[in-house]
């Protein structure tokens, strides 16, 4: 099994457990160039908030969009947008990625900005 298939298998297993909880999901996806975060409703059919380094407003002031500093900005932005929508408690869905580096930086920044998970 290649790395991508293994990651997707881990992600599917984690999503199944999160759906049973019935909580809002903070989903993270990373590529070498960008990092994306979405806040998805418990039913899975509605995106409540989103932020990524592909957005011009987030990208301003960043030297690079594929590093830990950029992930921190995305984490802070998604937390602010979630709180505007009235969401404070979420389940963190790392999409099978290791909780390390950019994924961990995004999560820590979101926690510092007021999200609870």
Curated annotation (Swiss-Prot):
Q: Which UniProt keywords apply?
A: Ribonucleoprotein, Ribosomal protein, RNA-binding, rRNA-binding
What are its GO cellular component terms? Answer: cytosolic large ribosomal subunit
Name any one Pfam family assigned in the record. Ribosomal_L18p
One molecular function GO term is: structural constituent of ribosome
Indicate yes or no for the key word Ribonucleoprotein: yes
Gene Ontology biological process: translation
Top-level taxon of origin: Bacteria
Q: Which InterPro entries match?
A: Ribosomal_uL18_bac-type, Ribosomal_uL18_bac/euk
Fetch the PANTHER family from UniProt: 39S RIBOSOMAL PROTEIN L18, MITOCHONDRIAL, LARGE RIBOSOMAL SUBUNIT PROTEIN UL18M
Quaternary structure per UniProt?
Part of the 50S ribosomal subunit; part of the 5S rRNA/L5/L18/L25 subcomplex. Contacts the 5S and 23S rRNAs.
Q: What does this protein do?
A: This is one of the proteins that bind and probably mediate the attachment of the 5S RNA into the large ribosomal subunit, where it forms part of the central protuberance.
Tell me which family the UniProt entry assigns to this protein: Belongs to the universal ribosomal protein uL18 family.
**The protein's name:** Large ribosomal subunit protein uL18
Traced from the root, the source organism's taxonomic lineage reads: Bacteria, Pseudomonadati, Pseudomonadota, Gammaproteobacteria, Alteromonadales
């Amino acid at each position: 099994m290649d790395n991508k298939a293994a990651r997707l298998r881990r992600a599917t297993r984690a999503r199944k457990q999160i759906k049973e909880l019935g909580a809002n999901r903070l989903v993270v996806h990373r590529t070498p160039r960008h990092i994306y975060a979405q806040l998805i409703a418990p039913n899975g059919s509605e995106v409540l908030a989103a932020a990524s380094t592909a957005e011009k407003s987030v990208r301003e002031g960043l030297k690079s969009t594929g590093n830990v500093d950029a992930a921190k900005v995305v984490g802070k932005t998604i937390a602010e947008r979630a709180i505007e929508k009235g969401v404070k408690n979420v389940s963190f869905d790392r999409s099978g990625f290791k909780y390390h580096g950019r994924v961990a930086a995004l999560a820590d920044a979101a926690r510092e900005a007021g999200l609870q998970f």
